[in-house]
């Protein structure tokens, strides 16, 4: 498994990985993050023993801040890679869980919606869409439409019942 600069991968238990975002100071997604997530997705799909992956943040104030649009403009191909990653994550056999503490905005919202389950801290979780403030909806901004899945979609509810959460 390759080293990643934007997050740490820990094989927590047999069949379970914990991915910890660590891109200080605010866990902003940059093109490198998206490329590395694509590599991570290939690793997840290639491990037949993997059952669960938990995504969390090292920073208690930010889960995923947002996309650095100035850097993304330099590499427009990453938006296609992002769409591919979100769709693969939402349909993989591995159960994906977002453990949310702190702010989650823009691309971070799309990320957590692609996960099968999401658990947010009542004390610190804050969700926001900065695209709205600049008049750019997700589709016009070129971002993936959160897989068309509502926040509490049927797969999410089914997984919670399955695991008795």
Question: For each of these PLM feature ranges, what is it?
Answer:
Residues 90-165:
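Crotonase-fold acyl-CoA enzyme core
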Residues 1-56, 60:
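Conserved CoA-thioester-binding segment of acyl-CoA-metabolizing enzymes
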Residues 35, 49, 57-88, 104:
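Glycine- (often His-adjacent) and acidic-residue-rich active-site loop
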Residues 28, 64, 107:
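Residues that form or flank phosphate/diphosphate-binding pockets in enzymes
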Residues 23-26, 69-70, 125:
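A short, flexible beta-alpha/helix-coil linker loop
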Residues 40-43, 81-93:
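Catalytic-core regions built around general acid/base machinery
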Residues 19, 55, 68, 111-113:
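Hydrophobic/aromatic residues within transmembrane alpha-helices
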Residues 31-32, 67, 110, 139:
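Generic recognition of short, well-ordered alpha-helical segments
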């Amino acid at each position: 498994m390759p080293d990643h600069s934007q997050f740490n991968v820990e094989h927590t238990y047999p069949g379970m990985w914990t991915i910890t975002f660590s891109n200080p100071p605010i866990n902003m997604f940059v093109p490198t993050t998206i490329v590395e997530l694509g590599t991570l997705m290939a690793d997840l799909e290639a491990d037949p023993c993997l059952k669960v992956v938990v995504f969390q943040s090292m920073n208690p104030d930010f889960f995923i801040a947002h996309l650095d649009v100035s850097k993304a403009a330099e590499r427009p191909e990453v938006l296609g890679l992002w769409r591919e990653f979100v769709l693969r994550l939402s349909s993989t056999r591995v159960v994906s869980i977002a453990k949310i503490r702190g702010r989650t905005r823009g691309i971070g919202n799309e990320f957590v919606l692609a996960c099968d389950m999401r658990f947010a801290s009542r004390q610190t979780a804050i969700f926001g869409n900065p695209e709205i403030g600049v008049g750019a909806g997700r589709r016009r901004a070129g971002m993936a439409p959160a897989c068309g899945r509502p926040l509490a979609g049927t797969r999410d509810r089914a997984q919670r019942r399955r695991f008795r959460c």
